[in-house]
Amino acid sequence: MLAVQEYLQTKSFSDLESELGIKTTYHESDPLVILNYNQIESPKLHPVVRECRGLVLNVNTHDVVVKSFNRFFNWGEVQDEMGDFDFTDFTVQSKEDGSLALIYHFDGKWRANTRGSFALDVMQFQGFTWQEAMCQALGADLQKVGVALNPQHTYVCEFCSPWNKVVRRYPNAVMYLLTAFDRQTLEEIPCDGYARSTGMLRPTVYEFKNIEEIQRFLQEQAEKDPTFEGVVMRDRHGHRWKIKSPTYLGLHRLKGNDTFNPKHLLPFILAGEEDELLTYF
């Protein structure tokens, strides 16, 4: 049982919002609610808050319908937990620069969510919904894709396309399968086979021995590929950390929330990279 399910045994979804800053997004017709922490209002290390990252529960039963990643942090952000990471057995994957997408089965059909919505809204400046865009990335509608999937699993993906660009450009709509969760056991499960059977991409896998090797790699990538976002490392206990490229962070700060902030231009100008900046925006 998740901590949020235990919480809801004695409290309500309204309490989640008022006490922990958890945003609730209800489906317009089905008994589903998306739970997401608030970057500012939610206590970031609270166990309930950590679980509420695109999590979907059945409103009536509180059963898990969609299980995504728990919240995880940038390396160095929560120093008390850095020592828990097991560098004797860990994997590293590229961090793709798109939008979280969650593919799941409910009430007899396959569906797809973004982290904060049921993907039924029209994408900004486009004539199609988020779900329709995801189907373009998958190359088929969700029901056809679902033939190769297990209805007891949530498929955690990164949807990348020209329509939801953050910093890195993706010329075509693509779907990266990041991992999968069994919604009964809540355990993470292998997903390479599902990627092969659906045509979804997988992040690039790297082999490193320690954090220093990762940081050197990212410094090299920053020079070769400035929009490369970074990597996610995961140990055998399921602990995850993200480590981002310094140039990606600079470009992301420069872009801001779709508004350019002049103060973030200075490091690029001092480095003589002002011409290169123009190619990213």
Over which residues does each language-model region extend?
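Core nucleotide-handling region used for phosphoryl-transfer chemistry
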Residues: 1-281
